[in-house]
């Protein structure tokens, strides 16, 4: 757990100016909220924070925040990054108690190759994460969905999942997690018959071709396509 400790300093100044000066020092503004307490405004080292969540749990890593000589258990709940440099600019922490369940989003992954895929179907995930409740120390790394027996046209719903011990899924039981779709058939264009040299035009082709003898060219015809004379050109 030593690698999951974040040292923080309380900050009194708020706003864009103080935040900018803080980033110039290599720190970022942060806030801790939760447990029906007023938010606490902090500053933390972004490099230390990113290193601390380099675990299989990623953003659901349980962190220990050291502040004013005390320790808080927190989760890294939200963040902001610079749109150009992609550097971390702000962090939000949720304070938790080790004996109280917390609601988090956990990644969903599939395991196995479905029967439907072997038959040419396309496996799709309707969602890439599910929300569940668990104790902070019992949050799973991921939820695995076995799709081995899934046939074309079939789907797996939340009711068919077995959550890890101590976890409760917070989704409707009929919510679709994964399904195997019927492959789309490619439409093949019908071949066009080649024109036979010297053959008479099809009925109506003459009407669509050159104008009748003595008739004026239609608007937009060859006469209309001639480039206009340049301004000042000799006539």
UniProtKB/Swiss-Prot annotation:
Keyword field: Ribonucleoprotein, Ribosomal protein, RNA-binding, rRNA-binding
Disulfide bonds: none
Region spans: Disordered: 1-21, 210-235
Gene Ontology annotations of biological process type: translation
Source superkingdom: Bacteria
Comp. bias (Low complexity): 210-222
GO MF annotations in UniProt: 5S rRNA binding; structural constituent of ribosome
InterPro entries attached to this UniProt entry: Rbsml_bL25/Gln-tRNA_synth_N, Ribosomal_bL25/Gln-tRNA_synth, Ribosomal_bL25_b-dom, Ribosomal_bL25_C, Ribosomal_bL25_long, Ribosomal_L25_dom, Ribosomal_uL5_bac-type
Keyword rRNA-binding: yes
Any one annotated GO CC term: cytosolic large ribosomal subunit
Chain intervals with Basic and acidic residues compositional bias: 223-235
Family: Belongs to the bacterial ribosomal protein bL25 family. CTC subfamily.
Function: This is one of the proteins that binds to the 5S RNA in the ribosome where it forms part of the central protuberance.
Quaternary structure, from the entry: Part of the 50S ribosomal subunit; part of the 5S rRNA/L5/L18/L25 subcomplex. Contacts the 5S rRNA. Binds to the 5S rRNA independently of L5 and L18.
Descriptive protein name: Large ribosomal subunit protein bL25
Organism: Anaeromyxobacter sp. (strain Fw109-5)
Gene it is expressed from: rplY
